[in-house]
Amino acid sequence: MSFPNSSPAANTFLVDSLISACRSDSFYSSSASMYMPPPSADMGTYGMQTCGLLPSLAKREVNHQNMGMNVHPYIPQVDSWTDPNRSCRIEQPVTQQVPTCSFTANIKEESNCCMYSDKRNKLISAEVPSYQRLVPESCPVENPEVPVPGYFRLSQTYATGKTQEYNNSPEGSSTVMLQLNPRGAAKPQLSAAQLQMEKKMNESASGQEPTKVSQVESPEAKGGLPEDRSCLAEVSVSSPEVQEKESKEEIKSDTPTSNWLTAKSGRKKRCPYTKHQTLELEKEFLFNMYLTRERRLEISKSVNLTDRQVKIWFQNRRMKLKKMSRENRIRELTANLTFS
């Protein structure tokens, strides 16, 4: 296995020599900007990368092909490059405090910085936006607090509202309420005239609804009566039973909808068949349960019903017969069984 001249495996040096060199001032550069290894031939082009240092170029080598700048993620803003003959330097001194808001380029930084210190109280309430995510805010370097991924932070609005609570200023409280509830901001701005107009519209709408309901119910009741009257007139007008039934139907239609104690609905019935019509349909059903289209048309003309009404009546009658036969069969089976 072969190593190049610049690899640390080919360079043979002891740890004691490093320690003795660290105790002396030979490992520090002339500008004292950061910790750099000496450009000696023993060290080659590699420094102590575990300590977060930058590689340096030896005096003998003009430029190395595989050499790249190894930037530690906690050393920010390494942008200044010098000539390849010299070592890389950073203008920022070592003793300066590293800001907490600086990350590498591939890490997504949060635009808002979480500030809980007293400096937040110095901000004016008008400068605090209602939606904190849209406006980026600069993170101060001297603030040691760490940004937290915030969906809603109470300190962003409560800090300003707390300072203005003692000043008794109504504008500050309104801005705080707008920040807490931005959707309901347009409601207090309604004028008194608009409120009166809305009340009038609601009253007029509530007054028109019962009249419409009564108008809708009355045509249905009126529409049901002429059909029954025409059917009864064709069958027999002189019979007293038909007259009594007609008078009862008129009384039912004239009376308003009954209360909840009686189980009667005020709407028109779904199958308004007279006694004569039901008798004729029952006779035909006893003769034949299933009708052809020609026979159904003849019956509908004789009974003064539509083709669809006769068809539906026969379907319902067949379902009723099926249900009755099932009940009778169950009753017979249970009667034959003896329980011990």
Swiss-Prot record:
Residue ranges, compositional bias (Polar residues): 203-217
Region of interest called Disordered, as start-end residue ranges on this chain: 185-268
DNA-binding region, residues: 266-325
Record's keyword annotation contains Nucleus: yes
Ranges of compositional bias, category Basic and acidic residues: 242-253
UniProt record similarity statement: Belongs to the Abd-B homeobox family.
Function (record text): Sequence-specific transcription factor which is part of a developmental regulatory system that provides cells with specific positional identities on the anterior-posterior axis.
Protein name as annotated: Homeobox protein Hox-D10
Species this protein is from: Mus musculus (Mouse)
Gene field: Hoxd10
